[in-house]
């Protein structure tokens, strides 16, 4: 099946706010390295940072509410380490088409597979995926469904089978029940993520909190799909390698939660601890994450390519 590729819809190129946000993020030079395009009938927005056709390829899924342009320094830096890097704006997020914030985990898995169909026409592989925050859950779900993904790096992995505490579990149950009656009712993101506090001290904090491309309100059916998804890694070992990248000062989920996830899941998970850093480290310290992610992916891809030769 041929997947349609179209030019991107970069809707804010002449916007003063967009220019100011990029300046505060200091990403103007990194954006010169990207090639943007849309994939499929759902117009999935992708941003490619190419290294070479025979280099390994990493797909990136951003954190909740956000989109991949905000992570340009991270994606460009990772590419310069020897990888083709492709950021995907989730359906209804950033520059991707669709009702704002509206997707299911299954739809995102399909979107990742469509993008892989396109990438395979240009790049030899191997292919890995890096998901940050809620993007980590989506990355893991995508790898469970698509065996082309041989390495999965999760920036703080939420596994809904394992609630951090009873308050989370009650909230998820409420979300599920409410979504049956009011699936399109939107819940403010600030009810469970305080961007202003998490980005405290970042030069672009105010701009990010006012960015029209960020999703600040989520339909209940999206939240229900995310927080009630059942990860297959809980009861099954997959062929892909996997790791959790977690700051020891994480304000959203404590480091102890990742240790619980590792002991609960049948899937082997490596833990990479980011010392003295919190949840927003990919935006706050992108160069640090570039080094850690590049080292891990290089190790996994090298093993895979060595095994392929034997």
List PLM regions with ranges.
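Catalytic nucleophile-loop/oxyanion-hole region of alpha/beta-hydrolase
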Residues: 65-67, 94-123
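Catalytic histidine-centered segment of alpha/beta-hydrolase-like enzymes
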Residues: 277-290
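An N-terminal hydrophobic leader/cap segment in hydrolases
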Residues: 1-38, 43-49
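Alpha/beta-hydrolase-fold enzymes
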Residues: 132-212, 216-217
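Conserved alpha/beta-hydrolase
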Residues: 68, 75-99
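Active-site glycine-rich loops that stabilize anionic/oxyanionic intermediates
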Residues: 55, 63-66, 248
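Short beta-strand/loop motif that positions the catalytic acidic residue
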Residues: 238, 244-246, 250
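Short alpha-helix in the alpha/beta-hydrolase fold that links the catalytic acid
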Residues: 74, 240, 254-263
